[in-house]
Design a protein with these regions (language model features):
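Short, charged/polar, Gly/Pro-enriched secondary-structure boundary elements
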Residues: 49-53, 111-114
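Vicinal oxygen chelate
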Residues: 1, 7, 31-34, 40, ...
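Short, charged/polar surface micro-motifs in flexible loops or helix N-caps
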Residues: 47-52, 60-62, 77-79
Length: 129
């Protein structure tokens, strides 16, 4: 049986501000924006990802800014960082963690933190026998 992670809730204080950040600055695709009384569900997906995030009202009780270090795996960390910086996102410099792993970090307006991650081809894989 396949089990697929497809939706990760992100707690935010201001849905419109967060929606604009993820759509316009980070470049996520807006999949849905549904309102039903007190419930609001905004689903956004990173380009090329099978997993989406959801922000809104009435969907999560976790305090805004409490999600830490969600990873966006990218094929070219320098290009990904440059794209975010060009869009106005404050991103750390790329850090070489050794073993072929590089990362850069940014926060959304509520303080939820994200990591751009690149692992060089073959890094961390056990030797073939």
């Amino acid at each position: 049986m396949d089990w697929k992670l497809e939706l990760v809730p992100i707690p935010v204080a201001d849905v419109e501000r967060a929606k604009a950040f993820y759509k316009d600055k980070v470049g996520f695709h807006l999949d849905h924006d549904v309102r039903n009384g007190e419930l609001r569900v905004v689903q956004l997906t990173p380009h090329g990802s099978a997993c989406s995030i959801v922000i809104g009202k009435g969907i999560i009780d976790t305090p805004p800014g409490s999600v830490q270090r969600l990873h966006l795996v990218v094929p070219d960390i320098h290009a990904a960082r440059a794209e975010l910086v060009e869009r106005g996102v404050e991103v750390t410099e790329v850090q070489d963690l050794g073993g072929g792993i590089t990362m850069a970090f940014f926060d959304d307006p509520d303080g939820n933190s994200w990591a751009l991650q690149h692992i060089a081809p073959g890094a961390g894989r056990p030797p073939q026998s």
